[in-house]
Amino acid sequence: MAAFLQTNISLNAIKIVPGKYSSLTDHQFRAPYRIRCAAASPGKKRYNIALLPGDGIGPEVISVAKNVLQKAGSLEGLEFDFKEMPVGGAALDLVGVPLPEETFTAAKLSDAILLGAIGGYKWDKNEKHLRPEMALFYLRRDLKVFANLRPATVLPQLVDASTLKKEVAEGVDMMIVRELTGGIYFGEPRGITINENGEEVGVSTEIYAAHEIDRIARVAFETARKRRGKLCSVDKANVLDASILWRKRVTALASEYPDVELSHMYVDNAAMQLIRDPKQFDTIVTNNIFGDILSDEASMITGSIGMLPSASLGESGPGLFEPIHGSAPDIAGQDKANPLATILSAAMLLKYGLGEEKAAKRIEDAVVDALNKGFRTGDIYSPGNKLVGCKEMGEEVLKSVESKVPATV
């Protein structure tokens, strides 16, 4: 399980000074450009955690993860002040917007944010700015969390749950570093217009500045340096101008990391290689849209999207930690959700958000222990194991956290 958290990049911070935040749909928050590390405060053992349960199974998995986080922290002498706030569809139903100002303020002033899931069929017909998913867009943009870290590891206990053959899936352990706040999702111009022939035209712009590429590349090089020393940069430099610049900047930085082996791969080939030979990858760095697609593809190698956590980090302000799965409204409220991705997101929160590596390792070890004992939610169940629900899986992890000796890292 150590592979889930096998990175030691210093992107975490001192608390930011509150900035400007103009409206719920056109946020203009600006924070000072400085490194944030909550753990940098000497002797600090009390942290403010913003909990954003969201929609669907979000409240269920957050409730379980909160208990595990609190227990692991208490065993390492940590105290948490939790502030639970509405977001996404839940906020729309409550106050009419996906990200209330009070929610954003609580998130901005916290030491770290743990989010459940956002979205659902109920709000699919809303106007774009009133869709639940826009809350996540605003949070990422305005907290300036530009680096998204998504581990994809096939645990020995779950190798048979992978969609790939055992000999292909066994031993897979990679980290995808995705640029999160630039590219085609944010580029201008964008929108749907009418051309001179009266025909509708949709425009989205893929655009990256050199500094945006450099900062995500540095995160990726540092990540690879702490893992197996291999970095693959994925682009489409044979066609896209933005990718030509991407490759140029990443290549230029490689001289600063002589201990990291850098390779380049076109995104279409990368998508194929993830299925053909996923073990060849250690650390992948790529842009926003390619990372969005490839990380979801990689998640299925592990056997279930319900197993994978993520961390979104910036140069200032709190980090955002969340499972990569969606809100799964079809199983919401039925105690069927797999809480392990959220529990492991809490472990990433401890390590990357707070610098509390021992507490993080307690959670990692507890997840492995629960799996070793045969406990499985429906998405990872196989005959011979014990089928449990969301709550019981959380309880088993909690028992394992309590029974473990002090963690060493």
Curated annotation (Swiss-Prot):
User: Entry's Gene3D superfamilies?
Assistant: Isopropylmalate Dehydrogenase
Task: State the deletion phenotype.
Answer: No discernible vegetative or reproductive phenotypes except a slight reduction of both male and female transmission efficiency, but decreased leucine biosynthetic enzyme activities and lower free leucine concentrations. The double mutant ipmdh2 ipmdh3 is lethal in male gametophytes (small aborted pollen grains abnormal in cellular structure, and arrested in germination) and had reduced transmission through female gametophytes (slow embryo sacs development).
Cofactor stoichiometry and binding?
Answer: Binds 1 Mg(2+) or Mn(2+) ion per subunit.
Record EC number: 1.1.1.85
**Factors inducing expression:** By wounding and jasmonic acid (MeJA).
Q: Which residues bind substrate?
A: R140, R150, R178, D268
Q: Which domain of life is it from?
A: Eukaryota
Q: Which cofactor does it need?
A: Mg(2+); Mn(2+)
- Outcome of substituting C390S: Reduced sensitivity to oxidation on enzyme activity regulation
Q: Which residues carry this modification: Phosphoserine?
A: S74
Q: Where is this site: Confers substrate specificity?
A: F137
Tissue expression notes: Highly expressed in seedlings, leaves, stems and roots and, to a lower extent, in flowers, pollen and siliques.
UniProt entry tagged with the keyword Cell membrane: no
Q: Give me the reactions it catalyses.
A: (2R,3S)-3-isopropylmalate + NAD(+) = 4-methyl-2-oxopentanoate + CO2 + NADH
Q: Does the keyword Plastid apply?
A: yes
Free-text activity regulation comment from the record: Regulated by a thiol-based redox modification; oxidation by CuCl(2) leads to a decreased activity.
Transit peptide from where to where? 1-37
Disulfide linkages recorded for this protein, renumbered to the chain, are none
As for pH, the annotation reads: Optimum pH is 7.6.
Name the family.
Belongs to the isocitrate and isopropylmalate dehydrogenases family.
PANTHER family from the UniProt entry: 3-ISOPROPYLMALATE DEHYDROGENASE, 3-ISOPROPYLMALATE DEHYDROGENASE 1, CHLOROPLASTIC-RELATED
Record's function text: Involved in both glucosinolate and leucine biosynthesis; catalyzes the oxidative decarboxylation step in both leucine biosynthesis (primary metabolism) and methionine chain elongation of glucosinolates (specialized metabolism). Catalyzes the oxidation of 3-carboxy-2-hydroxy-4-methylpentanoate (3-isopropylmalate, 3-IPM) to 3-carboxy-4-methyl-2-oxopentanoate. The product decarboxylates to 4-methyl-2 oxopentanoate. Required during pollen development and involved in embryo sac development. More active on 3-isopropylmalate and NAD(+) than towards D-malate.
Name assigned to this protein: 3-isopropylmalate dehydrogenase 1, chloroplastic
